[in-house]
């Protein structure tokens, strides 16, 4: 396990702020000082195809970060700086189709952030129709192309993934195909038709990738649920519950220093 990942394992907090489109920027993160182990900003578009898709999503009334690509590098430096006021590590969630077009922005992110998180999670049709977001986990060769180049950035690379989009065996096989090129998995334990997380699949995934950092996500809004998911993950992440102001349990969990 490399030194950067060892440092992540030594973090004394167990809750991560998950990315929420159009919401989790530096100004949002800085409001939560000393609450999270990691704050994730984004997701951000790094090329013209995803930028256009993002603008199209906004036309449907959904929030997005549609940042002018020419202004992105200066924008992201400022957002990371603000996010650091949370006293957490800063992860940046990104998406792109053309890694060559995205690469100068990835270089800027790598210079200023602690973690780069590749979005293999988005299910908006404007994104999935480009073959990325959750569709990326079906295309191991494209995923490997992206990760091979991202590995050169010399930063921990995490994948934000969604369970139950493809069969678990296929997901594991495709992740094994790129195993040498990523350091962590941010796992949305999405369970279609169920009001709770798919813990069984998370357990299998965590056992298969026990050399990686695992962040569990989905429906975590209490100490009890967090502790249950932490049986199979190194961290848990939260999103919508934060928008409801439900943070006291996180403070209590931090005090336990588990």
From Swiss-Prot:
Task: Tell me where on the tree of life, at the top rank, the source sits.
Answer: Archaea
User: What residue ranges carry the coiled-coil annotation?
Assistant: none
Q: Which NCBIfam families match?
A: nifR3_rel_arch (TIGR00736)
Which cysteines in this chain are paired by disulphide bridges?
none
Under the heading Gene3D superfamilies, the entry gives: Aldolase class I
Q: What is this protein called?
A: Uncharacterized protein MJ0144
From which source organism is this entry? Methanocaldococcus jannaschii (strain ATCC 43067 / DSM 2661 / JAL-1 / JCM 10045 / NBRC 100440)
Q: What is the lineage of its organism?
A: Archaea, Methanobacteriati, Methanobacteriota, Methanomada group, Methanococci
Pfam families xrefs: Dus
């Amino acid at each position: 396990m490399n030194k950067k990942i060892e440092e992540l394992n030594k973090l004394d907090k167990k809750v991560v702020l998950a990315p929420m489109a159009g919401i989790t920027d530096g100004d949002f993160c800085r409001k939560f000082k000393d609450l999270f182990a990691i704050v994730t900003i984004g997701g951000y578009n790094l090329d013209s195809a995803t930028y256009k898709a993002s603008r199209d999503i906004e036309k449907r009334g959904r929030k997005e970060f549609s940042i002018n690509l020419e202004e992105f590098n200066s924008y992201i430096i400022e957002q990371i700086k603000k996010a650091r006021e949370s006293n957490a590590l800063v992860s940046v969630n990104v998406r792109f189709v053309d890694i060559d077009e995205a690469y100068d922005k990835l270089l800027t992110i790598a210079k200023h952030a602690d973690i780069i998180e590749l979005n293999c999670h988005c299910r908006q049709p404007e994104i999935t129709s480009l073959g990325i977001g959750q569709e990326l986990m079906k295309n191991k060769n494209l995923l490997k192309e992206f990760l091979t180049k991202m590995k050169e950035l010399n930063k921990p690379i995490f994948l934000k993934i969604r369970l139950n989009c493809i069969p678990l065996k296929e997901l594991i096989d495709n992740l094994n195909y790129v195993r040498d090129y990523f350091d962590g998995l941010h796992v949305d334990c999405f369970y279609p038709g169920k009001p709770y997380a798919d813990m069984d699949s998370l357990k299998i995934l965590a056992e298969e990738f026990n050399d990686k950092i695992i962040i569990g996500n989905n429906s975590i809004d209490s100490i009890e649920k967090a502790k249950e998911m932490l049986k199979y993950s190194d961290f848990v992440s939260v999103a919508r519950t934060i928008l409801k102001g439900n943070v006291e349990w996180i403070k209590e969990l931090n005090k336990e220093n588990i």
